[in-house]
Amino acid sequence: MNNAEVLNVALDEDSSNSNDDLNYSEYQPKNHPIKSHYDMDIENVHFLLEPTMSKKKCETEYLPGTTSFGMSVFNLSNAIVGSGILGLSYAMANTGIALFMILLVFVTVFSLYSIHLLLKTANEGGSLLYEQLGLKAFGIPGKLAASGSVTLQNIGAMSSYLYIVKYELPLVIKALMDIKESNGEWYLNGDYLVIMVSLAIILPLSLLRNLGYLGYTSGFSPLCMVFFLIVVIYKKFEIPCPLEAMNMTSNSSSHDHMAHNETDDEMCKPKYFVFNSQTVYAVPILTFSFVCHPAVLPIYQELKGRSRRRMMNVSNVSFFAMFIMYLLAALFGYLTFYSKVEPELLHTYSKVFGAGVIFVVVRLAVLMAVTLTVPIVIFPIRSSLNELFCSGKDFAWIRHILITFLILAFTNVLVIFVPTIRDIFGFIGASAAAMLVFILPSAFYIRLVKKESMKSVQKIGALLFLIGGIIVMIGSMTLIILDWIHNSTSGGN
């Protein structure tokens, strides 16, 4: 098979030709050295490519996949699940059970539809790299939009991880040292602790040029979340309602609008439809929780027996599993605390159990998972910045260290000064996540899939999806900013 045949991926979707699904098992790359600046920096191999595809890049992109269906499902599930699960109970408390389930179904279905568009665009556009699709569709602006959205989403994810460190590590230290009351000790200050963890653990790991086996620790994250889900379900039947401990904290500004006039009966009665100033955060939180699109194409590339249908089956199984997991976590967390649930569910339990052994174990597991995940998240951010601003330059340790330090410093500043994790979920979910889920896949599809006219059902559907994504992004961002302004003028958080 020659190179022209390899790159000829713009075929009809229903064609029986195996090339339609990027199945290039016949292509055998030659084993000889190829000079490229990507050889100098391992970070750049699977990220932003140059417009002119060299032979090595062709070989890298179209090698036959070797990952099994089950492992691909695990990898995609791992890419989906993250800190967003901790904010879902808060979203349910501010939408009601019925409205939350409706929104959850819609976000799940729309996310799967956008993956369908992305996979078809990858076939038609001849690339399995997200940023490269942006370059082919809209040139440099498209590449910048894709790279910027991925970078912003990763910064948001990293911020949420460090925010968990900021608020959970002091509780773990208090429990391990059996400290009942805090008197302002520096080692119980979350701001100091997140900086120390960043400098002592995250920075050295992030400076590695090749993360190697650290990448396998990312598989620890979904296991921690499953453990967390089991504990949430179990504790629902152990915690009484109403909660006196939670009643003592009902003057929290984030819950005043819901709880200040509630009786015990009202407080323990689930609500099915809720509309308040915090409802606007529901869609961004859900969108943030389902973003996995930058990882879809690399997983597709590695899938054994690669085909669009097989990858959609992987996506369907992964999203269904996450749908069930998210629904159970949100439902049982909400039915435990009702309107008193906080933006970060795990932190809410500290108001009831304090230093309970089981939650110390949960916190330690989650802290270990998020701490080891941050260097993995920094990896693609640094690669994108290197490619955007230092393309073609040889690797330099000074630049490598400086970029890593600036990324980590910027994220620490965000974590220290942003009032709640809700604001991170909301802003990133309404901006970068909306771009990755709604806007970019549909825009790439409309631009790169040439064989379908704009009057076709597929193109009209993609156009409506694009318009809907723009409305969601602008509407959510506007309402979130208005809520911030209202809180700042009223002395809230």
Swiss-Prot record:
Cytoplasmic-side positions: 1-72, 120-154, 206-213, 301-316, 380-400, 445-459
Sample GO molecular function, one term: alanine:sodium symporter activity
Reaction catalysed by this enzyme: L-alanine(in) + Na(+)(in) = L-alanine(out) + Na(+)(out); glycine(in) + Na(+)(in) = glycine(out) + Na(+)(out); L-serine(in) + Na(+)(in) = L-serine(out) + Na(+)(out); L-proline(in) + Na(+)(in) = L-proline(out) + Na(+)(out)
Disulfide bonds listed in the record: 241-268
Region (Regulates protein turnover upon amino acid deprivation), start-end ranges: 1-92
GO cellular component: plasma membrane
Organism superkingdom: Eukaryota
Record entry for activity regulation: Inhibited by N-methyl-D-glucamine. Inhibited by choline. Allosteric regulation of sodium ions binding by pH.
Signal sequence extent: none
GO BP, sorted A to Z: alanine transport; amino acid import; amino acid transport; L-glutamine import across plasma membrane; L-proline import across plasma membrane; L-serine import across plasma membrane; neutral amino acid transport; proline transport
Annotated membrane topology: Multi-pass membrane protein
UniProt comment concerning the protein's domains: The extracellular C-terminal domain controls the voltage dependence for amino acid transports activity.
General function of this protein: Symporter that cotransports neutral amino acids and sodium ions from the extracellular to the intracellular side of the cell membrane. The transport is pH-sensitive, Li(+)-intolerant, electrogenic, driven by the Na(+) electrochemical gradient and cotransports of neutral amino acids and sodium ions with a stoichiometry of 1:1.
Protein name: Sodium-coupled neutral amino acid symporter 2
Species of the source: Xenopus tropicalis
